[in-house]
Amino acid sequence: MDPSIPRSTIRCLITVSLLAAICLTPFQAGLAQTSANQSFIRINQLGYKTSDPKVAAAFANAPLAERFSVVEVNSQQTVFEGTARPTIGNWGQFRHHAELDFSSLKKSGTFFLRFNAADSAPFSISANTYHEIADQSLEFMRQQRCGYNPWLDAVCHSFDGRTAYGPLPNGTYLNAAGGWHDAGDLLKYLLTSSNATAQLLLSYQMGESHTIFNDRFNALGQPVSNQTADILDEARWGLDWMLRLHPTPDQLYHQVADDRDHKGWRLPQNETVDYGWGSGSFRVVYFADGKPQGLSKYQSESNGIANLAGRYAAAMALGFQVFSKNADTRDYAHVLLRAGREVYLLGRAKEGVQQGNSYGAPYRYAETTWPDDMEWGAAELFRATGERHYLNDAIRYARIASTESWMGKADAGHYQFYPFMNLGHFRLYSIAPPSIKRLLASYYRDGLEKSLTTGRTNPFNAGVPFIWCSNNLVVALATQAFLYEQMTRDKRYRTFALKQVDWLLGRNPWGTSMITQIPAAGVFPRDVHLMTVAILKRPVKGGIVDGPVYMKIFKSLRGVSISEPDPLAAFQDERAVYHDDIKDYSTNEPTMDGTASAILLWTLKAID
């Protein structure tokens, strides 16, 4: 989101520029070189699952060696030798690239790669590589909570909010407390929170039998167990807020606050913005009327509410599926199901999209897709009720949604194709007749093939366009590939999908994980565009940052800049730039919904 008063601190994360001053982390100090022949090895810093393909990336300005080795850290013995596979293309100033494939190494332990007179950072190989990361990422979600925030041990925005555009007189009080702050700012969106809530519930449902979710925190996010998996506590935080946004069967509200929020850095409990009812007081709550909205000169292009309604129904129906299993939460489950049914009908009555609202800047969530959401909602309602009309609806909406996606495109509007992959196709697949199963698989395959083509345009096989929030696209691409494999048992995309996972965890030009504080001994974003972290100088674990963008996007956005000199200058390219700098909200701002989607990906990898 658009910032206001950023600070100018910058931290160096990786070995950098051959021309500028270099700054090393302890993690990489052993790799320091200063010659023009310097080479770099990029790995998945979290490590590799024993059975997974394992492909590192290496690059340099000079021709690369032919052979590489894998060395065990403890014994210093070489345990694997292989031939480097040259890859076509360049990145920035680097003209020579290769892949180091050690997939056949199945031994558990801690190792490093040796290649071209350089050693990689240590990495692990283990069957349990991904068992903790989903749970660890919940720390970021708790830190984003609005209302009582356990990370801050403080209450914020208890006055949310007063209505706009609804059937009630403008300025009428509506209890919209709770939920999550969207990113580095303090807005709250049903548009993103519905997706986050549903993906958390799906993560729990898919991982429930694999003992990867812990109970270390209570419902308030305090460090006390409560006989409920922490991921369910977090999902319920989202569900409870969503229920407040649907106070009557015919009403749905969709956004709290707007970009008037961007008025200086403060902790959430120290709110100062005036939305017309006094400094730090009530914030506006927008009603979902399916029409263009905007209380100043910038208007959305809304033409319905089915995108919100479909995701809302999916989250509520998933909540019913999970919470109806326990006698203590069965009544709550039926409340969820009733709300899901009601809002789904609102979506059927007003097909189209309700976009996010802006006020003083042209940036908003400009979603244009909705059949995918209605498909997902209908599929989950059928799973919850067994009522055939929901299945018929899901199939109808699936045909309309088809292959519509950002995949294969060089550009797209901000959150135009949202969610970034269609979970409706996956959730419909197992309950659909055979002919529809084949169709759904073909839809997923179409996007994966297009992304494969995109991946061939860069030496790292990143299969996404580097638009704003590209890391969310990477998460979606990998998730779609793993779900396709679950659906069809077709493993042709597995290596490609794992390269996307590896990209997020360090196998990228900048050599950094894109997840805050993960892995603990690795290189990860430190100077993130997040008010709580910046003010308190206290790191938070588990948040996925927006990720690299086209250089032209970075140069075009309002209020974005970096400290100079750029410590990552050697690794920037016209195709993508990334900065671990608080002033760059386009690449280094963690997002709530991106983190929730990543939790589903981490769950899929843990149970794989």
Model-derived regions, located:
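Aromatic (Trp/Tyr) and acidic
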Residues: I41, Q45-A121, A127, E139-A198, ...
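Bacterial N-terminal signal peptides
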Residues: L13-P26
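Boundary at the C-terminal end of the N-terminal hydrophobic targeting segment
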Residues: A32-T34
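Acidic, glycine-anchored loop motifs typical of Ca2+
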Residues: A219-I231
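Acidic, Ser/Thr-rich low-complexity linear motifs
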Residues: G356-E367, G408-Y415, N458-W468, Q517
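Carboxylate/His-rich catalytic cores and anion/metal-binding grooves
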Residues: D230-Q251, V256
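C-terminal transactivation domains of fungal Zn(2)-Cys(6)
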Residues: L295-N303, A314-Y365, Y429-S430
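N-terminal secretory signal peptides that target proteins for export/translocation
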Residues: M1-I10
